[in-house]
Every structure is written in C-alpha cells, then in structure tokens.
Amino acid sequence: MSIFKDQFPRIGVSGQSTGYTIDQSIRFNDDDSGRMGRTPSSETNRRTWTFSAWVKRGNLDSSGNKFIFSRAEASKAAYIGFYQDDLTYAAAGGSLEVNLVTDRKFRDPSAWYHIVIAQDTTQAVSRERVRIYVNGVRETSFSSETYPSENYQGYFNTTSLHDIGVSRPSGSISGYFDGYMAEINFLDGYAYDPSYFGEFKENTDIWIPKEYTGSYGTNGFYITGSNSSALGEDFSGNDNDYTTGGLATHDQVLDSPTNNFVVMSSIDFTYDAIRNGNLETIGGNNNKGGRGTFGFSSGKFYWEMLATTVSDGYPGSGVVYDEFDPDMPAAYAGGGTNHGAGASHNQAIWYKQSSSGSTYGSIASSGDILQYAVDRDNNKIYWGVNGTYRNSGDPAGGSGAVASSLTHYGDWMPYVNHGSNAGSSAGTFNFGQDGTFEIGRASCRERV
C-alpha cells in the first residue's frame, strides 16, 4: 500500500475548485482487456441519440482502432473511438453508411477530452444529422466525411451487444481502449449539444463539466464508476447496468476531469513500454525512459514508485528538467549543468548536476517503495525507501536533502529510465490517484 507523507502535497492535482465535480474515473488497461458490455432487451430510437464522455488517453498505440463505444455483429456495426489518433464515428451495414474522421489528432496523455456525438437523422441538412464536439467546440474539419441519409436507422439502440472500451464484430474482440473514462452518458431519443453536459469556465476558454439533469430514454445510461465493485452500474434510473470484464475495484481512480493527476508520458515511451493508465513503465533493452506529464517551477510535491522489478540497477528514477532527453540513463539525469537529480538503484547513488554522486544506504530491491519529496521553492530533493528517508532526510524541516542548490529555473518533472540491459525492469508510480499499487505485483506489495 501507499506510504504517502502528509507534509508535501501530491504532484499534479489540478482542476476547478468550485462548482460541479467528478470524483473518479474508470481506468481501462488494454493489457487486461478492460471493457464493459450490455445487450438491450428492446429496440428503441435508432435515428436519434447522444453519446457524451470524458476521456483521457493512455498508451498511444496508433495502429488500428481504439474503441470508446461500439455495437457490432457479423454484418452491421457502429463505433465511436480513435483511429490512428483521429476521433472517429463510423457505421456500416454491408457498405460504409457513416464515416466522420477528424483532421486533428488527439495525442495529449495529460489532457481530459470531453467528447459529444449527437445523431439526429431526421434533419434535412446532411451535416446536421451527426455533430461531433470536443471540449465544447464543434469539429468541422474531417479527413473523411460521409453523413447518413435522411431518416437513416443506425445500429445503436438495437438488441445486439453494445460495448464500452472495445468492439466485438463477429464474436471476436478488437481495439481495446487504453486510458480513463468518466461521466459516460448515453441518451436514447435525444440529440443534444455539449452545453447540456459542460460549460466554459467564466472568462476563459477552459471547458469544465456540469451536471446533466435531463431525460435518458429507455436505453439511456449514466455510468460514473462510483461503485468500485460494479464499475458499470447505471445511475440514470434505468438500471441499464453494463457488465465488466478485465476491470477490478482498483480501476476506480481519483484522476478525473476536475482533479487531473500527472501520469508518465506515453509520448516519451513506445506503446508496449507503458501500461495501466500510464502509471506502470517497463524495460525493453532499449535504454528507454520518460517524464511525467506535468512539471512544476514552484511549490512542494511528493510521489512514489513501486520498484516492481529491479534489474541491473533499473528502473532508475529521479527528477529532471523539462527539456532533458528521457532516453538518457539515470546517472545522466544529474550528469550535466541544470539537469536535475537521478538515482541509480543498483548503487543507491544520487547524481546532482554533475557526473559524480553520493551513496545513500543500501540498494533498492524489487518490491521496495521509493519516495520522492521535492521542495522546488528551496531547490531540494529528498529520497526515501519504504517509509524512511535516506541521508536522515526531513522534508518538513528542510534538512538531509540528497540534492540541493539546483539551479535550473524551468519546470522540473518526474523521471524514470529502464537502461539498455534491463529488459525485465518495471516500476509503478503513484502520484496520488491510486495508492493501492494493485497494478504492481502482489508479492512485491507484501514486502513493504
């Protein structure tokens, strides 16, 4: 379990301080085949519906489809998702009947996107039959743009299986979504714009959520993830619960559109080296490393990493400045002017802005929880293992830092590297959104 200290706040917590709040999200890990599904008992309005959800992407595997919401069978299918990082809504029944693919890419792993797709095929103007919005703004530029015919009867709201986080055409499963979802609304018989679900924060262009208070229709649903033992529970009043697969209680996390946490950046890592909502990184004999999605230039912050597997001294970890090359090994995190500080765990050495370093205690082992307390205001970094700070560190009192007098004036960021010979190394981060470390190995947790 987590050993969070209280003297420093948790890194990355942000969001609105007043108004409507979203308390949690659901983490979908494609390696666990995370998904949920439901088969409606009756066919309802196939012409008119609205889908609304907040989405934060995990790994950025750009191959193929990553499905957010879908309905598929042997010859008829409809889906909302990402295709090579483009937001897409498509439907086909022997031929392609709807196909809207945005020009712009959605590749920011630090961002929550509010996606709204409203269909009303009774509209006389073709482009008004399907409207796509992201963060309150309508998408108008598409690389592919095929609208349904007037009074077209689509494939949502039929009596076939509907899925969240995956698609299952012809009984096979494909295109697992990887990342987080929150506030999943589906309205049966209503085509609403995003103002029903969100609003611009006063005097800004920042889109924030608000409570939906309207009707849902017969097959409508509202999934919040607030019940960790039944993440697909419907809170619309319809009891249209979705059955989950590959999801566990620890996949309810605090990361949300109104409380956005730092994760490790999937832009730095290849898609097969990062997983579990960008909180777990793994080695691949390629000297690959990465930074967190948020940096900080002032304040005091704390986070942890479970060293799931230590191999050849890795994962190395620490704090680096925002322009540091993430592929450089841990020693180089402190190997040049203004770089930051990094630990090589097979030697328990912290390097600080030079190629030399100081040794603090015994080496870190698989199963250890490594602690990082960073006082950016006073340019000090504290490092601990399993609840005890090395160098008799006292972050609250300001003594015993393993690195101090750092001079870089830009943003500092969390950092990890797996080395060139550490193919089995792995580390799981906790920036405050999930202190269970359930996504690490149980045998490791029992050691701390």
Language-model features and meaning:
Residues 1-10, 35, 225-281:
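Short, tryptophan-glycine- and acidic/Ser/Thr-enriched carbohydrate-recognition patches
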Residues 2-191, 205-232, 388, 398-401:
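Extracellular glycan-associated modules
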Residues 54-61, 117-122, 294-296, 304-310, ...:
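Solvent-exposed strand-to-loop "edge" motifs in beta-rich extracellular domains
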Residues 65-89, 316-350:
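Glycan-recognition/cleft segments
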Residues 139, 156, 160-161, 165, ...:
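Aromatic sugar-binding interfaces of carbohydrate-active proteins
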Residues 258-344:
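Conserved, ordered domain cores of eukaryotic regulatory proteins
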